[in-house]
Design a protein with these regions (language model features):
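Bacterial N-terminal signal peptides that target proteins for export
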Residues: 2-11
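C-terminal motif of bacterial Sec signal peptides marking the signal peptidase cleavage site
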Residues: 19-22
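Bacterial signal peptide processing site
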Residues: 24-27
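A short beta-strand element within beta-rich, extracytoplasmic domains
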Residues: 58-69, 132-138
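Short acidic/polar inter-strand loop motif in beta-rich domains
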Residues: 68-70, 115-120, 124-127, 137-147
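Short coil-to-beta strand junction motifs in C2/discoidin
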Residues: 71-78, 152-156
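A beta-strand/beta-hairpin structural motif
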Residues: 96-98, 106-124
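Internal, hydrophobic beta-strand segments that form the core of beta-sheet-rich folds
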Residues: 128-164
Length: 166
């Protein structure tokens, strides 16, 4: 009887392990950077360096934002720069919806912390292999003001991820 229980435990462990591994098959790169006091400083760019070998298959690129209930806006403006190994650079100003019309945050999560997986580039084929650098900083302003908010509260983590397309 003890032998059967041991085999069942091993079998269940292997099933769980294979499930966990298969869930991450699509992820090529994923990294988060925590922000002190859940505050994103306007003059602090967040950088992610990653290596690209595959220049044939398309990938989906995501900006990942973890916000809490102190985030004061229903949207988020960011400025991104993707630097290529050959010196080329793509700069984008992007807007993402963070809350619905009722003010409920759109990200996933059951607590006050919400995970937002935001499309940055869809089906991107990297033209050259080598080291890439992704930079992001927020560009949030209060209505009617010109200056960027120096300390954006409620942003706990900023991440960047690359996934294989299905």
């Amino acid at each position: 009887m003890e032998m059967i229980l041991k085999k069942n435990r091993i079998f269940i462990f292997l099933i769980v392990l294979s499930f966990l591994v298969s869930c991450n098959d699509q992820i090529v790169f994923a990294k988060y950077k925590s922000l002190p006091n859940a505050t994103w400083e306007a003059n602090k760019s967040i950088s992610f360096e990653f290596e690209v070998e595959d220049t044939i298959l398309p990938k989906n690129l995501f900006i990942n934002i973890r916000n809490n209930k102190k985030y004061p806006f229903s949207n988020m403006y960011v400025i991104t720069a993707l630097s290529f190994p050959n010196g080329n650079k793509i700069v984008d100003t992007l807007q993402y919806q963070m809350a619905d019309k009722s003010g409920n945050f759109l990200g996933k999560g059951f607590t006050d912390i919400k995970d937002n997986k935001l499309f940055y580039k869809e089906e991107k084929v990297f033209p050259v292999s080598g080291k890439y650098l992704f930079n992001i900083h927020h560009a949030m302003r209060k209505n009617g003001e010109v200056n960027i908010i120096p300390f954006l509260e409620g942003v706990q983590d900023v991440g960047f991820s690359i996934e294989k397309t299905e």
